[in-house]
Amino acid sequence: MFLARNAGRAGYRGVVAYQQAASFSVSSAKAAGSRSSGGSDAGDYAREAAEHAKAGLKDLKNEASWKAKGVANQAAGAFERAKDTVKEGVHDMKRSGSRVFEQGQEEVEAGAQHAKAGYQSAKNAAQDTAATLKDKAGSAWNQAKHVVEDKGEDVVEAVKDTASKVWGKAKHVAEDVKENAQSPGGIADKASDVWSAAKDKAADVLSGAKHTAENLAHKAQAAIHDATASSGSQSQSQSQSQYRQGQQQGRQDQQQSKSQWGQTSPQSPDGFRPQAGQGPQGGKGPGQAGGRR
């Protein structure tokens, strides 16, 4: 809108140049008419020149108003197209970001489920091993007890030693299973690694969505700037060219009117005949509207 307003002002300056030339022609024609008798050819000439000048000025004003409106409409259309581009980019970004976020969330949830399943499997395996070893130790103790009951107290010590060895071995195996589950690189660490990888993947996905949004915003701003600058500069250049043409045409009309008045003005009844340089400055003959294009 700022560029359209500037273009309208440039066109108005061209109208002002024509208006000044036409006003000067009207004033000169009226002055010549006042020096001549009423109803003479000079008076008619002055009135007709004034009417043509007024008509030409009105046409110029209408043309300038129409061109200013056209420039404003072009600028408004460019701005609306840029806004539509921005809206489409925002909608695309939202849809893309939503899909990316959902995919990242699914990957995180899958990693968590995998880690949970691995930990539960390790826990179940440790419990099963401990239960098996406990059953074996109980069976060995019962066997030893039966041996003692059958063979007497002389083998009690041997049975105790055997049972102690079996229990010690079972306890050692259970401790090894527990250490393997909690040691570096074990099941717990693997579950933690899966969880960390899932979180990193989600962070990368969100960062990519943010970068895409910034690129769309830059493209939208560039589209607005290009559309507005192109429409405004073209209209302003046309208005400035018309302004220069108006000034040149006004000067030519003044010289032509001065020459015609000095050469063709009729002699008044009292013998007065305007000489070159004494007639209206910038007046125009019939049929030549001042400033009309």
Swiss-Prot record:
Keywords: Mitochondrion, Repeat, Stress response, Transit peptide. The keyword Mitochondrion applies. The keyword Repeat applies. GO terms for cellular component: mitochondrion. Transmembrane segments: none annotated. Residues 27-52, 217-293 are annotated as: Disordered. LEA 11-mer repeat repeats lie at residues 58-68, 83-93, 123-133, 134-144, 145-155, 160-170, 171-181, 199-209, 210-220. Disulfide bonds: none annotated. It is found in: Mitochondrion. Residues 27-43, 230-265 have a biased composition (Low complexity). Residues 279-293 have a biased composition (Gly residues). Residues 1-31 form a transit peptide. Belongs to the LEA type 4 family. Mitochondrial heat soluble protein acting as a molecular shield in water-deficient condition. Improves osmotic tolerance of human cells. Contiguous repeats of the 11-mer LEA motif is characteristic of group 3 LEA proteins and form an amphipathic helical structure under water-deficient conditions. This is Group 3 late-embryogenesis abundant protein, mitochondrial. The gene is RvLEAM.
